[in-house]
């Protein structure tokens, strides 16, 4: 009915009678087959829930301290892998550009935070990263704060 109103309004003539909508089908309606239940989709292992995330391993007798002297930003992955394997890492940035070293330190800070570890500055360009199962005693330099500044106000 609304279509007839708009057709007349815009001057379009419709030759088909409107009563075609009122005819009933001569055949009774067929019943649709019952829906077949589909199996529930399986979960993909590409997404890891927080509860299943990797946690720092428990202390064992094979814990090591790794020494790393990165040359490029990609070497940061090696440092984080050592941490995830439960080893402490001493990192010397002496041979690296300061801007790239800063980016690696930020990467290391994120990794140590994720495994509840610690990162400490030993010297101007030397850092100690430890997983949760290591205890650091003594204090050579201040611990890095979350904003990247140590107690001396140095940024790293």
From Swiss-Prot:
Localization annotation: Cytoplasm
GO cellular-component term (any): cytoplasm
InterPro entries, per the entry: Cell_div_SepF, Cell_div_SepF/SepF-rel, SepF-like_sf
Protein's UniProt keywords contain Oxidoreductase: no
Listed Pfam families: SepF
Quaternary structure and interacting proteins, as annotated: Homodimer. Interacts with FtsZ.
Name this polypeptide is given: Cell division protein SepF
Protein source organism: Limosilactobacillus fermentum (strain NBRC 3956 / LMG 18251)
Lineage of the organism: Bacteria, Bacillati, Bacillota, Bacilli, Lactobacillales
């Amino acid at each position: 009915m609304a279509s007839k109103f708009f057709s007349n309004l815009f001057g379009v003539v419709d030759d088909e009678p409107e009563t075609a909508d009122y005819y009933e089908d001569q055949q009774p309606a067929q019943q649709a087959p019952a829906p077949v239940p589909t199996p529930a989709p399986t979960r993909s292992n590409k997404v890891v829930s927080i509860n299943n995330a990797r946690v720092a391993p428990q202390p064992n007798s094979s814990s090591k301290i790794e020494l790393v002297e990165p040359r490029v930003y990609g070497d940061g992955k090696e440092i984080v892998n050592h941490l995830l394997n439960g080893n402490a890492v001493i990192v010397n940035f002496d041979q690296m550009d300061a801007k790239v070293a800063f980016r690696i330190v930020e990467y290391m800070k994120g990794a140590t935070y994720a495994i509840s570890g610690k990162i400490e500055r030993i010297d101007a360009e030397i850092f100690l990263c430890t997983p949760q199962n290591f205890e650091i005693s003594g204090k050579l330099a201040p611990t890095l704060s979350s904003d990247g500044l140590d107690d001396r106000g140095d940024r790293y």
